[in-house]
Amino acid sequence: MNYLEGVGSKKGGGGIASESQFNLQRRKEVESLLSKGENVPYTFQDEKDDQVRSNPYIYKNHSGKLVCKLCNTMHMSWSSVERHLGGKKHGLNVLRRGISIEKSSLGREGQTTHDFRQQQKIIEAKQSLKNNGTIPVCKIATVKNPKNGSVGLAIQVNYSSEVKENSVDSDDKAKVPPLIRIVSGLELSDTKQKGKKFLVIAYEPFENIAIELPPNEILFSENNDMDNNNDGVDELNKKCTFWDAISKLYYVQFFFKQAEQEQADV
């Protein structure tokens, strides 16, 4: 330790260190031991790509104080940094950062592959199912939106009845939810049904259910009481259906655009 420039020192002789100088030197030594001699860069410095650091989120700001870029915290000493690195907040942020990087590395191509495989599983499960001839219990009620007076339908289908053996061979097949589809009369072979429209509810291995609908356009935005079905194959299934896999109850609800609304749109 050099005390030549201390108070009361003489040229050529060891000076007397003041208490403040001694404390400053001791803090520097402690900081060096805690940081293991690592050179902490400033936030405005460009890091080298080949530089490997044990604490890559710790930097010095313009005033020389230690900061954690990940958690946006400032620390007066390296001992405070050590406590922060071992704390819950920094650990959670590192975990979130890792998950974010993993998702971004998956990319759009990886997500598309995952969705394709999921659809293939559903198709294979449906192909292996066989119709058992069971007609589920269906309840239909007319509902009215108190906000604008729109009239709609609320449908409950009970799929909790027993099915024949070997109709469902695995849990993966049971996870395939029911679905709905609007079928126009033009798609039917019966010429008497050409001007009609039907709602078809399908859930293998049960029989399909067909419900005749009025010609009015369906409103998706009015279906506020129904939780979104994220497993739905399209907008109709996502916004107008709810599948309770535990009770095996399937709910469908939507409203129709009234004549006044259709004229206003025109």
Curated annotation (Swiss-Prot):
Protein function: mRNA splicing factors, PRP9, PRP11, and PRP21, are necessary for addition of the U2 snRNP to the pre-mRNA in an early step of spliceosome assembly.
Any further remark recorded for this protein: Present with 3460 molecules/cell in log phase SD medium.
Zinc fingers (Matrin-type), renumbered ranges: 66-96
Cellular localisation: Nucleus
InterPro entries: Matrin/U1-like-C_Znf_C2H2, SF3A2, SF3A2_dom, Znf_C2H2_sf, Znf_C2H2_type
Name recorded for this polypeptide: Pre-mRNA-splicing factor PRP11
Taxonomic source organism: Saccharomyces cerevisiae (strain ATCC 204508 / S288c) (Baker's yeast)
Record GO biological process: mRNA splicing, via spliceosome; spliceosomal complex assembly; U2-type prespliceosome assembly
GO MF annotation list: RNA binding; zinc ion binding
UniProt record similarity statement: Belongs to the SF3A2 family.
UniProt keyword annotation of Transferase present: no
PANTHER family listed in its UniProt record: SPLICING FACTOR 3A SUBUNIT 2
Gene: PRP11
Keywords for the protein's UniProt record, in alphabetical order: Metal-binding, mRNA processing, mRNA splicing, Nucleus, Spliceosome, Zinc, Zinc-finger
Region Disordered: start-end pairs: 1-21
